[in-house]
Amino acid sequence: MRRRKAPVREVLGDPVYGNKVVTKFINKMMYDGKKSVAEKIIYKAFNKIEEKSGEKGIEVFEKALERVRPLVEVRSRRVGGATYQVPVEVRASRQQSLSIRWILEATRKRNERMMVDRLANELMDAASDKGAAFKKKEDVHKMAEANKAFAHYRW
């Protein structure tokens, strides 16, 4: 275990848009350190979104992240031999990382042939309140709503 808390390193903006969230998305998408491949996929997906919908790719991306962002989630809490699913609010940084993770998971599960098409379609779906990533957020919110009775077990 480390002696001190690790400092949070500042993320630089991506090369095209200068956006830190896009950089985080690229880093999460990357496999085996192949950042250039991940960047190409994302920028091509943004171009494809512009062709299909006429909106700017980065705007659709930001709207999709906003729509998939969870406000509450459930955490397991053990009380007297019973485990309760306790609803808790989600920190802003975790909201962002969860939305990125869920969009990528949903993208990888889609059945289009090319990753560019999968990502573009999932981002457009999420921006318009559809798709697997948005459904995941809805499920998490429903779970928190169903377990509202245990909210007093918060820590």
UniProtKB/Swiss-Prot annotation:
Task performed by this protein: One of the primary rRNA binding proteins, it binds directly to 16S rRNA where it nucleates assembly of the head domain of the 30S subunit. Is located at the subunit interface close to the decoding center, probably blocks exit of the E-site tRNA.
Cited SUPFAM superfamilies: Ribosomal protein S7 (SSF47973)
Similarity-based family: Belongs to the universal ribosomal protein uS7 family.
Protein name: Small ribosomal subunit protein uS7
Biological processes, Gene Ontology terms: translation
Natural source organism: Helicobacter pylori (strain Shi470)
Keyword annotations from UniProtKB, A to Z: Ribonucleoprotein, Ribosomal protein, RNA-binding, rRNA-binding, tRNA-binding
GO molecular function: rRNA binding; structural constituent of ribosome; tRNA binding
The keyword Ribonucleoprotein appears for this protein: yes
Quaternary context: Part of the 30S ribosomal subunit. Contacts proteins S9 and S11.
A single Gene Ontology CC term: small ribosomal subunit
Keyword Nucleotide-binding attached: no
InterPro entries from the UniProt entry: Ribosomal_uS7, Ribosomal_uS7_bac/org-type, Ribosomal_uS7_CS, Ribosomal_uS7_dom, Ribosomal_uS7_dom_sf
